[in-house]
From Swiss-Prot:
Gene3D superfamilies: FAD/NAD(P)-binding domain, GidA associated domain, C-terminal subdomain, tRNA uridine 5-carboxymethylaminomethyl modification enzyme MnmG/GidA. GO terms for molecular function: flavin adenine dinucleotide binding. GO terms for cellular component: cytosol. Belongs to the MnmG family. Homodimer. Heterotetramer of two MnmE and two MnmG subunits. This is tRNA uridine 5-carboxymethylaminomethyl modification enzyme MnmG. Signal peptide: none annotated. Its cofactor is FAD. FAD binds at G14, G15, G16, H17, A18, G19, V126, S181, Q372. GO terms for biological process: tRNA methylation; tRNA wobble uridine modification. NAD(+) binds at residues 275-289. Coiled coil: none annotated. It comes from the Bacteria.
Length: 628
């Protein structure tokens, strides 16, 4: 072995969506950072669907952008169709989703990283980690390189002991056509005793664009004006916008699957890993929803200069000959040719309960994990974890501090709290329904929630900060102006817009805007106010803050109650067996989950209010009642 590199501050293992965010933010925080990946050309690659965002996921992308991350900007510059989902519903569940030119996206990510100061790229496979006295010291590569570092972040995605299944064929791979990382998985499990389990995910076959009969299909176009992920104004020329197309499976499709279900690795026992509940294979859909006559399929373009179509909704691991039959049984795809077969992939993942909320390991100091290795599914969940791990790795080096958002601050807070407190037995996907504070942590206010924090952490550059600061001031001043603008009505005007006003015949502009049917622009049309803001995003923000003020205050009161328990620390060295009055079940669960606060302990199934009271009394009695 040879050691020909000077000591690096932070090493990131893996160049996917978690690894790229971790590398970018760590380098931005002036740490000497190295990203090691098996193939530099596939950095930032979209392994499965050519899209970013969606319900819950779009919220994460907005939060990443608000904190100075790179996914949002890259998506805005490579998007070929943008839509706002749930646009007719309330602001809490509205979400941005974009179809992405996958080649353009990865090239943009690579360009951002190549231009980032303090960041070095290395094409190698990491096969071991160096540890002394439970502290990380570096990594070992397959070429025999020893690279010393103060911190290591592992972001291996599905590559950790990955195995691909197509029918009865199986082969070791981290992604189709790429090597799996077997030795690193063995080291983590056998040498360092991490709890390692198996998960499974899948992808549909790709279809030759030229072989699709689009005249038989329903078109779906993007929104105008085009929504975006980044809070920075888009500058430049957008890529050409393309439609998606909709088709459906049918009785013939379902019969092919049912008649050949024994050839599915999911149903013949070949696959042991648990797959994503909210992104099931077409085999699962047909079996589990047997009374359903059809399933919707979205035919999504893979890019402007790409000849392939991604059929979203028919992930499968059936043999290739059956995949062809299934595809050709569908309207518009009767003559379709498959360019790449669909497959399922099993891979190892780490039990996230072995991690702190910073995503640092509880077992080895200075070792972080982020992305699918922690049991999540999706680019957005991975990228959010990468950002958090990179921030905390840099903070640890600088002054030993740390940062993570609470559940009431961000969907990222919900994500890490769910994972690190409760763990997961299936690929974890973010939804707005996972948050009990979704009216507070909306897509539209991600910058108002997080950009100031990012500035304090040193990851928000001046142009973004100035943009945010101006926006925040405009919103604050305009809401104040609306509250102070009193309007006098005569009887005719009052009846015209059906207003209930007080006896004096006056009402503020803010009170009028509270009404659900009144918009900010209505105030101008009725000559209630003379000024006019031009920025539609600022106008929307003002409307939301005023119209939902009562509901928001109610949620804030609930948050304050929960914060008390979240702030009471449970010391690492606490021995729950010594706390008299706790049942064996409670002690067992506390030792398994290892909560770091009373707030975390409360969320564990089986931990009773009585048990929490006993622990609180014990902490007070032993002078261990510390707040964060």
């Amino acid at each position: 072995m040879c050691s020909c590199y000077k000591e690096i501050d932070i090493i990131i293992v893996g160049g996917g969506h978690a690894g790229t965010e971790a590398a970018a933010v760590a380098a931005k925080m002036k740490c000497n950072t190295m990203l090691i990946t098996q193939n530099i050309d596939t950095i930032g690659q979209m392994s499965c669907n050519p899209s970013i965002g969606g319900i819950g996921k779009g919220h994460l992308v907005k939060e990443i952008d608000a904190m100075g991350g790179i996914m949002g900007i890259a998506a805005d510059n490579s998007g070929i169709q943008f839509r706002t989902l749930n646009s007719s519903k309330g602001p809490a569940v509205r979400a941005t989703r974009a179809q992405i030119d996958r080649k353009l996206y990865s090239s943009l990510i690579q360009k951002i990283l190549s231009n980032q100061k303090n960041l070095y790229l290395l094409q190698q496979e990491v096969i071991d980690i160096l540890v002394e006295k439970n502290k990380i010291k570096g990594v070992v590569t397959n070429a025999g390189l020893i690279i010393k570092s103060k911190i290591v972040i592992i972001t291996t995605g599905t590559f950790l002991n990955g195995k691909i299944h197509i029918g009865n064929k199986q082969y070791v791979s981290g992604r189709s056509g790429e090597f799996s990382s077997i030795k690193l998985s063995q080291i983590l499990k056998e040498k360092f005793c991490f709890r390692i389990n198996r998960l499974k995910t899948g992808t549909p076959p790709r279809i030759d664009l030229k072989s699709v009969n689009f005249s038989k299909l329903e078109s779906q176009y993007g929104d105008t004006p085009i929504p975006q992920f980044s809070f920075m104004k888009f500058v430049g020329i957008r890529p050409k916008q393309l439609p998606c197309y909709i088709t459906y499976t049918n009785k013939n499709t379902h019969n092919i699957i049912i008649d050949n279900i024994k050839h599915s690795p999911i149903y013949n026992g070949s696959i042991k890993g648990i797959g994503p509940r909210y992104c099931p294979s077409i085999e699962d859909k047909v079996v589990r929803f047997s009374k359903k006559e059809s399933h919707q399929i979205f035919l999504e373009p893979e890019g402007l200069n790409n000849y392939e179509i991604y059929p979203n909704g028919i992930s499968t691991s059936l043999p290739l000959n059956l995949q062809i039959k299934i595809i050709r049984s569908i309207k518009g795809l009767e003559s379709a040719n498959i360019t790449r077969p669909g497959y399922s992939i099993e891979y190892d993942f780490l039990d996230p309960r072995d991690l702190k909320l910073t995503l640092e390991s509880k077992i080895i100091s200075g070792l972080f994990f982020a992305g699918q290795i922690n049991g999540t599914t999706g680019y957005e969940e991975a990228a959010a974890q990468g950002l958090l791990s990179g921030i905390n790795a840099a903070l640890m080096l600088k002054n030993g501090s740390f940062w993570f958002p609470k559940r009431s601050q961000a969907y990222l807070g919900v994500l890490i709290d769910d994972l690190c407190t409760l763990g997961t037995k299936e690929p974890y996907r973010m939804f707005t329904s996972r948050s009990e504070h979704r009216l507070i942590i909306r897509e539209d206010n991600a910058d108002l929630r997080l950009t100031e924090i990012g500035r304090k952490l040193g990851i928000i550059e001046d142009d973004r900060w100035n943009n945010f600061y101006n926006k925040k001031n405009i919103i604050y001043k305009e809401i104040k102006n609306l509250k102070n603008t009193k309007i006098l009505f005569n009887k005719e005007e009052k009846n015209k817009i059906n207003l209930n006003i007080n006896k004096s015949g006056s009402i503020t502009a803010e009170e009028i805007l509270r009404r659900p049917e009144i918009t900010y622009n209505d105030l101008i049309c009725y000559n209630f106010i003379k000024r006019k803001l031009k920025d539609e995003e600022i106008i929307k923000q003002i409307e939301i803050q005023i119209k939902y003020a009562g509901y928001i205050k109610r949620q804030e009161k609930e948050i304050n109650k929960k914060t008390y328990y979240d702030n009471i620390i449970l010391p690492n060295e606490i021995n729950f067996k010594k706390i008299s009055g706790l049942s064996k079940e409670v002690i067992e669960k506390l030792n398994i989950f290892k909560p770091t606060s009373i707030g975390q302990a409360i969320k564990i199934s089986g931990i009773t209010p009585a048990a929490i009271s006993i622990i609180l009394i014990w902490l007070k009695k032993n002078n261990l009642m510390y707040n964060k």
